[in-house]
A protein has these predicted regions:
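Short terminal alpha-helical segments
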Residues: 1-26, 78-88
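Alpha-solenoid helical-repeat scaffolds
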Residues: 2-6, 25, 29, 46, ...
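Amphipathic alpha-helical interaction modules
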Residues: 18-60
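Amphipathic alpha-helical binding modules
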Residues: 59-88
Length: 88
C-alpha cells in the first residue's frame, strides 16, 4: 500500500470515529475531503487525465463552503457528480 492510500484509509477511519455527536454536515465535509484525497491519488497514476484534474480542482475550490455557503456546497456536489460521469 502506498503512503497516500494509507493516509486516506486512516482519514476515513478516524473520520468515522469522530462523527457521533458532530453536526450532520460534517459527514458530507469529511466525505468530500476523502473524495479530494482519492482524486489526488488517482492523479499520481494518471497525471495526463484532465477530467480528473478538473474534478479535483472543483472539489478543492468549493469544499470549504459547507459551513458558510451551504447551498453552494450542495450545488458543487451536484456538479462534481456530473463530472464523475465524464471521468468514466
Amino acid at each position: 500500500m502506498k503512503r497516500g492510500e494509507l493516509e486516506l484509509l486512516i482519514y476515513l477511519i478516524t473520520s468515522a470515529q469522530g462523527l457521533p455527536g458532530e453536526p450532520r454536515i460534517y459527514g458530507s465535509i469529511r466525505l468530500t475531503e476523502a473524495a479530494y484525497k482519492l482524486c489526488r491519488i488517482l492523479q499520481e497514476r494518471e497525471p495526463e487525465n484532465e477530467k480528473l484534474k478538473a474534478l479535483a480542482e472543483r472539489l478543492e475550490q468549493d469544499k470549504g463552503k459547507a459551513l458558510s455557503q451551504e447551498e453552494d456546497f450542495w450545488n458543487m456536489l451536484q456538479d462534481v457528480s456530473g463530472m464523475l460521469v465524464e471521468c468514466m
